[in-house]
Amino acid sequence: MQAPERLRQQQFALAKHIRDPEANLPPPDIEDRRLAIYRELFFNNVEGLLAGNFPVIREILDDDIWLDLVRAFYREHLCQTHLFPEVPREFIRFLETRIEQGEQDPAWLMELAHYEWVELALDLAENDEAENDANIVGDSILDTAFSLSSLAWPLGYQWPVHRLSPGFLPENPPSEPTFLLVRRDRDYKVHFEEISALIFRLLQLISDAPELTARQQLT
């Protein structure tokens, strides 16, 4: 066996052991004390990254539940990127998979995770330079076609995600959904605003058909 291939297999064995030491034996001839350092270092890096990006979830969940969730993500999820800013999005994909598998996570967990991720996603989003100002036609604003900025996201949730906290965790979602407009201003600050169902629907219509005038959108 050539040395590069042998090294590659050793690296894979080490990586599998670090991710799931209970199911994968370590490479031979490596002292467990040294392996323990790597196991703790790698896991703590991932846990710290997720805790920093999902602070409300981290605050709500008990330590054991949170660490078990992170451990499952660390052990089971195959990330599609090596970029650290994309790891929170991978965590959301992991939660989606858990829903499909019937895992008994809190009912609000997926939506709260998405809500917390949005701030990072919008903070890193690139502005669409091709966007134009409103195309004013005639003297009436109703005859103007508007387009929605790529840095303004209308979002709808079953749960009041902007209010969830250790002191406010309803057993069931309210009868009315929560609608939010999340936007990034020119100073790169992200803002969250609660909006009505009517405004949410109007923003959806503008996003779906920016070529239509306001008058056409309302008819």
Regions found by a protein language model. Give the residues of each.
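Short acidic, hydrophobic short linear motifs in intrinsically disordered regions
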Residues: 202, 211-219
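N-terminal, charged low-complexity regulatory/assembly segments
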Residues: 1-126
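Glycine-rich, acidic and aromatic/proline-enriched surface loops and short helix-turn segments
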Residues: 208
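Hydrophobic packing positions characteristic
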Residues: 75-201
